[in-house]
């Protein structure tokens, strides 16, 4: 943000750390949050996808607790939603996050990698659904300047 003032940058940083703290604090309670605070509009679309076993890609916004929407989709009967993730660089943080996710229902997570893409394609070919966040960065390919 080259045109942002020091005050603006400080506010962005403060808000970012506050949001990250909330996200971390919510992790142990994700299952409760999905059923209480996550409302689905146009649920008939999800019901149709489930009924017809339609492969599709759900695209979400990387805002607040990004796990909630994917978990809510997985609660929809008949859907088989796998999520794309990028493991944190810190291996201990990655292990903690993985332990807080619920794998009891056979939930699928696809690593943001070439192998993960292959797994996603296979999942879609088997009439599954994939959830991805619009800002997930991949370091291969063409580099583009953004936020100029």
Where are these regions (language model features)?
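Negatively charged linear elements and acidic catalytic determinants
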Residues: 1-36
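Soluble catalytic domains of membrane acyltransferases
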Residues: 23, 31-148
């Amino acid at each position: 943000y080259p045109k942002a003032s020091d005050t603006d940058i400080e506010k962005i940083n403060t808000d970012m750390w506050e949001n990250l703290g909330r996200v971390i604090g919510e992790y142990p309670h994700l299952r409760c949050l999905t059923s209480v605070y996550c409302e689905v509009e146009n649920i008939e679309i999800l019901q149709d996808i489930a009924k017809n076993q339609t492969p599709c890609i759900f695209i979400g916004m990387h805002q607040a607790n990004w796990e909630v929407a994917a978990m809510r989709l997985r609660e929809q009967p008949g859907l088989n939603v796998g999520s794309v993730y990028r493991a944190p660089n810190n291996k201990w943080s990655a292990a903690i996050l993985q332990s807080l996710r619920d794998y009891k229902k056979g939930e699928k997570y696809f690593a943001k990698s070439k192998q993960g893409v292959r797994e996603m394609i296979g999942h879609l070919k088997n009439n599954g659904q994939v959830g991805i966040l619009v800002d997930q960065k991949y370091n291969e390919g063409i580099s583009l300047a953004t936020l100029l």
